[in-house]
């Protein structure tokens, strides 16, 4: 049994999703968004750190997975996204959680079956996979997708290596 916290980072909205993995079953635990104020970036980064630290205390996850930075046309946006990711990763490492990172293509492939899936397709599949009554908000669905991707990656590695331990994958020390 493992509780996985998935995070879709953003400097304005950071999505989070928590699933409990029991055997081959993925059970929805919770999800939502951390919406930062329109204050200066350092204050928003602290809000992300504090928000995720509280979520970690509330849900007590065993593993932490986050979406990797993508290349953006706007360098300033990419830098802010990288800083938001950093705040999220520090919250995880402060709680001694192993950190895994996945690209958007890996996440979409794990959830939908194609790395070129649209946001609406990810939302629909997350609703189906986790048996939710309605589709979650886009950022929360993306975060749940990160958690589902991590679960599938762990299952695949374990199948390949017997008792492979993916906790070392992407771990920050």
From Swiss-Prot:
Its cofactor is Mg(2+). Pfam families: RuvC. One of its GO terms (cellular component) is Holliday junction resolvase complex. It comes from the Bacteria. GO terms for molecular function: crossover junction DNA endonuclease activity; DNA binding; magnesium ion binding. The active site is at 8, 67, 139. It catalyses: Endonucleolytic cleavage at a junction such as a reciprocal single-stranded crossover between two homologous DNA duplexes (Holliday junction). One of its GO terms (biological process) is DNA recombination. Mg(2+) 1 binds at residues 8, 139. Belongs to the RuvC family. HAMAP family: RuvC. This is Crossover junction endodeoxyribonuclease RuvC. It comes from Shewanella halifaxensis (strain HAW-EB4). The lineage of its organism: Bacteria, Pseudomonadati, Pseudomonadota, Gammaproteobacteria, Alteromonadales. The gene is ruvC.
